[in-house]
A protein has these predicted regions:
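A short pre-motif secondary-structure segment
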Residues: 135-139
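Amphipathic, Lys/Arg- and hydrophobic-enriched alpha-helical face
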Residues: 24-42, 59, 125, 170, ...
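Structural recognition of an alpha-helix C-terminal capping motif at a helix-to-coil junction
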Residues: 33, 47-54, 69-81
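C-terminal edge and immediately downstream basic/flexible tail or linker adjoining helix-turn-helix-like DNA-binding
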Residues: 10, 151-154, 168-185
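Sigma70-family region 2
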Residues: 12-13, 40, 53-68, 89
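Arg/Lys-rich amphipathic alpha helix in sigma70-family domain 2
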Residues: 62, 77-95, 114
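N-terminal module of bacterial RNA polymerase sigma factors
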Residues: 1-30, 180, 185
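Acidic, proline/glycine-rich intrinsically disordered inter-domain spacer in sigma factors
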Residues: 100-126
């Protein structure tokens, strides 16, 4: 499979919309969830996602493959900047995505229990400070290394480790308040 870096550099050189579409398909879901951490509204997150890719298409910001960090961290940085500009304009507060759970009658008990735990996890995440929620999302959902998270969030590496530690402690307390004491992280 071709790397994101190669696809974007080819797109920047040749203007082939298929390359940009391939990148959108690869990163759509992750970016939407990331952007939902900034805005409370799925429509706003979708709009910010499209703005991010429009910026890639029209402005063609200079991705430098020789600089440290991956295409993914660069893309998330652009999305983050778009989200922060959006927040400044509209002054929204953040809320995480509430996951749709299928009808209970159609699911086995184990799936229902997992769905309920996930719902409680999202609910607990919504009580965290936005910076804790973002750092935990990038670390555990996007599986990004601390160095990339630092670049995306505009922090140094020690600050990222500190936020992860504080975020995990806050999440544990929130889950305990909800009656979940067996959470592993």
């Amino acid at each position: 499979m071709e790397t994101d870096e190669k696809i974007y550099l080819r797109y920047a050189a040749e203007d082939d919309d298929a390359d940009l579409e391939a990148l959108l398909i690869r990163h759509r879901d992750g970016l939407l969830l990331f952007l939902l951490g900034f805005v409370r509204n799925a429509e706003d997150a979708e709009e910010l996602l499209m703005d991010t890719f429009a910026k890639l298409a029209v402005d063609k910001p200079g991705f430098e493959p020789d600089r440290p960090g991956s295409f993914t961290s660069w893309l998330y940085t652009i999305a983050r900047r778009n989200a922060l500009m959006h927040i400044r304009k509209r002054r929204y507060e953040t809320v995480p995505l509430d996951e749709d759970i299928p009808s209970e009658s159609a699911l086995p008990d184990t799936v229902l229990l997992k769905a309920e735990k996930n719902r409680k996890l999202y609910q607990a995440m919504s009580t965290l400070k936005p910076e804790y929620r973002r750092v935990l999302y990038l670390l555990y959902i996007e599986n990004m290394p601390h160095e990339e998270i630092a670049g995306i969030m505009g922090l140094n590496i020690r600050q990222v480790y500190h936020l992860v530690d504080r975020g995990k402690k806050s999440l544990k307390k929130a889950l305990e308040r909800m009656g979940i004491t067996d959470a592993r992280y």
